[in-house]
């Protein structure tokens, strides 16, 4: 029985991998290969990962790069802005912001898609809201999430630090 293992990894410097910020998240998928000579496709169905690099091992030979495909999941879509300068570093920064928004706007506005919790932190969502509205058509996304904010308002008028409230005391204000 052959098993392929896929791990998300953040590579900070050449040859160095940093995963401490994952906390308890393993960010590891294991797939038992059928042994199909024509090839196999693996796509996780009940999880998602935020990553920059992936590590695949357990195969007899390395996969060619074109055989590996990342799929972007997001709850927004239509980009409403563009930005380009003569400085490629600034262009890269803007594109990284767009990718960060796409990776963190999946059902609720999260602060990081790679860790062991993906909660709709109200402070992060509020701070980034203006930028988000310039970048993409987020009206339906924020409208739906703000209904959840209202639905989760405490009897005393307080709001939780994250919405929806799940599993932990909300420690709201």
Question: Whereabouts are the PLM-identified features?
Answer:
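Extended, hydrophobic alpha-helical segments in both membrane/secreted and soluble proteins
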Residues: 127, 159, 172-173
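A glycine-rich phosphate-binding loop feature that marks nucleotide/adenosyl-phosphate handling sites
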Residues: 117
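Generic alpha-helical structural context detector
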Residues: 130-133, 147, 151
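Well-ordered alpha-helical scaffold segments within catalytic/enzyme domains
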Residues: 59, 127-138
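Short acidic-aromatic active-site loops that bind/stabilize oxyanions
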Residues: 94, 135, 171-172
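Short, intrinsically disordered, charge-balanced linker/junction segments flanking boundaries
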Residues: 1-2, 169-173
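Extracellular/oxidizing-compartment recognition motifs
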Residues: 3, 7-114, 123-124, 140-143, ...
């Amino acid at each position: 029985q052959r098993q392929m293992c896929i791990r998300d990894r953040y590579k900070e410097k050449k040859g160095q991998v940093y995963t401490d910020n994952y906390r308890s998240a393993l960010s590891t998928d294991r797939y038992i290969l059928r042994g199909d000579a024509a090839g196999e496709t693996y796509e996780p169905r009940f999880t998602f990962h935020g990553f920059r690099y992936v590590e695949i091992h357990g195969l007899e030979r390395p996969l060619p790069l074109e055989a590996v495909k990342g799929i972007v999941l997001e709850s927004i879509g239509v980009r409403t802005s563009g930005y380009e300068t003569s400085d490629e570093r600034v262009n890269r920064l803007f594109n990284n912001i767009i990718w960060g928004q796409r990776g963190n706007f999946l059902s609720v506005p999260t602060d990081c898609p790679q860790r062991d919790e993906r909660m709709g932190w109200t402070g992060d969502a509020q701070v980034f809201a203006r930028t988000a509205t310039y970048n993409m058509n987020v009206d339906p996304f924020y409208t739906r999430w703000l209904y959840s904010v209202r639905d989760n308002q405490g009897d005393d008028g307080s709001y939780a630090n994250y919405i929806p409230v799940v599993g932990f005391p909300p420690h709201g204000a």
